[in-house]
């Protein structure tokens, strides 16, 4: 029997995923990290990106908007600001959020918070890419 590891993806609102998996690739702060069973203990920051999860020979994606990941004793815990399985993403809503962020960035007003608009744009693009 192939070795597996537990993956828990948790947000402040809910547990998004909690099952045994074969492999995960996560968007670490310094680049992508591939985690196999019995990986060395690790704690890292996550950036906005997509978790790619292999479970039972099939792959699926989870869009995350930053957070932290801990790997210990063949258990992976992802504490994310937000997390959404690709098959549950409302693409039209994500496209609308992208358009709003682009409009804010293109506005000439001085009251715009450019940093927040850039983050919103990056998150919306990530959700759209994950759903593809």
From Swiss-Prot:
What keywords would UniProt list here?
A: ATP synthesis, Cell membrane, CF(1), Hydrogen ion transport, Ion transport, Membrane, Transport
Q: Does the keyword Glycoprotein belong to this entry? A: no
Q: Which GO terms describe its molecular function?
A: ATP binding; proton-transporting ATP synthase activity, rotational mechanism
| NCBIfam families per UniProt | ATP_synt_epsi (TIGR01216), PRK00571.1-3 (NF001846), PRK13446.1 (NF009980)
Could you tell me which InterPro entries the record lists for this protein?
Answer: ATP_F1_dsu/esu_C_sf, ATP_synth_F1_dsu/esu, ATP_synth_F1_dsu/esu_N, ATP_synth_F1_esu_C, ATPsynth_dsu/esu_N
| CDD domains according to UniProt | F1-ATPase_delta (cd12152)
* Subunit: F-type ATPases have 2 components, CF(1) - the catalytic core - and CF(0) - the membrane proton channel. CF(1) has five subunits: alpha(3), beta(3), gamma(1), delta(1), epsilon(1). CF(0) has three main subunits: a, b and c.
Asked if the Swiss-Prot or TrEMBL record annotates the protein with the keyword Ion transport, the reply is: yes
Q: What does this protein do?
A: Produces ATP from ADP in the presence of a proton gradient across the membrane.
Question: What is the organism field in this record?
Answer: Desulforamulus reducens (strain ATCC BAA-1160 / DSM 100696 / MI-1)
- The gene is atpC
* The protein's name: ATP synthase epsilon chain
Per the record, membrane topology reads:
Peripheral membrane protein
